[in-house]
């Protein structure tokens, strides 16, 4: 290969995580957020993080969508995890808020989360969790319960580091890494 004919992207050593808990009661101070810190702890246990920041907001698409856009496109977070708003309650609108801004869906993550959840409980079938990219950020929506957060993250964390590397331009062949 001649010099200058190939651009190699360095593999990242650490990732920036933002987590967002959607809860009307939590945002009003009527409930302690347990899912948000759990998202951070579970992710930190499997991925090297250089920065993490958490948010508690009401179940409101007009609050969620601009926050995710700012975190991804304005501040350059690598990974955004949300908890809550993926069910069928009237104010569960997380998928509707985020699907219009996703550039690419990540159906493999969605399917892995659903499969893992259904293995534990049949009520997981009502989850509408989605995953996608926005710029160089992976955005994943998770159900609101601590149990579902851990189960869903356990299903996708083994592939998440590789997905982030690829999204950031890692040119190595999949399955042939040193």
Q: What spans do the regions from the language model cover?
A:
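Non-catalytic beta/alpha edge segments that cap or flank active sites
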Residues: 1-178
């Amino acid at each position: 290969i001649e010099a200058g004919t190939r651009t190699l992207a360095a593999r990242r050593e650490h990732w920036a995580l933002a987590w967002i808990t959607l809860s009307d009661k939590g945002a009003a101070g009527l409930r302690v957020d347990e899912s948000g810190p759990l998202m951070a702890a579970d992710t930190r246990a499997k991925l090297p993080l250089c920065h993490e920041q958490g948010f508690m907001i009401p179940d409101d698409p007009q609050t969620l969508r601009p926050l995710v856009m700012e975190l991804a496109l304005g501040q350059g977070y690598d990974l955004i995890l949300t908890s809550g708003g993926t069910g069928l309650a009237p104010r569960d609108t997380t998928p509707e808020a985020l699907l219009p801004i996703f550039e690419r869906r990540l159906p493999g993550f969605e399917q892995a989360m659903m499969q893992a959840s259904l293995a534990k409980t049949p009520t997981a079938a009502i989850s509408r969790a989605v995953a996608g990219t926005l710029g160089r950020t992976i955005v994943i929506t998770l159900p609101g319960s601590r149990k579902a957060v851990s189960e869903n993250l356990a299903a996708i964390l083994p592939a998440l580091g590789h997905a982030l590397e690829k999204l950031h331009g890692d040119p190595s062949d999949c399955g042939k890494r040193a």
